[in-house]
Amino acid sequence: MKKYLVISGIDGSGKTSVINALKEELERQGHSTQYIWMRFNHYSVKVMNALARVLKLSVPVHNDFGDVWEHRLYKSPLFCKIYVWCSYIDNRIARRKALKLDADFIICDRWVNDTLIDLGAECRIPVILGSKWYNRFKKILPKNTEQYVIVRGRKDIVDCRVEN
């Protein structure tokens, strides 16, 4: 039976290194593996992002990495509610990509937890991982899914990634 392994963690936590080592070890043991990046599955959210720009809920800012759009979605609770629903729908659609893969282990680079953390930050939803949204999003995950969060010391993260 196919098993899904979701690897989560902040930028610089070592997800890629863990995923590569995990894939190598599972294949060494004779298991087939496939990798899929499951973050930013935007379909309807693309429309919401465009609308956010028109409504000035996303604004252009200049930082060390150049010109980027900064979300300030929290300024409109109604917009946030619709945005979270759209993200939920998009993740349900994206689930099909993972289900189509055929291997003993499907390694998912980020997914539900990472999406929820982003939504919590953009919409200022406190404790989103303990909310009704977590329960809804969690049901998107296929059966036989295990989630792992990579934890790394703050100094190590800051030292390895300039943007942190």
Which residue stretches match the model-derived regions?
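ATP-dependent small-molecule kinase phosphotransfer cores
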Residues: 40-128
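Hydrophobic anchor at the beta1->P-loop junction of P-loop NTPases
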Residues: 7
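Walker A (P-loop) ATP-phosphate-binding motif of ABC ATPase nucleotide-binding domains
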Residues: 4
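ATP-binding Walker
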Residues: 12-13
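Post-Walker A helix-loop "phosphate-sensing" segment adjacent to the P-loop in P-loop NTPases
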Residues: 24-35
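Conserved phosphate-donor/acceptor-positioning beta-strand/loop module used by diverse small-molecule
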Residues: 104, 108-114, 130-131, 138-161
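Walker A/P-loop
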Residues: 16
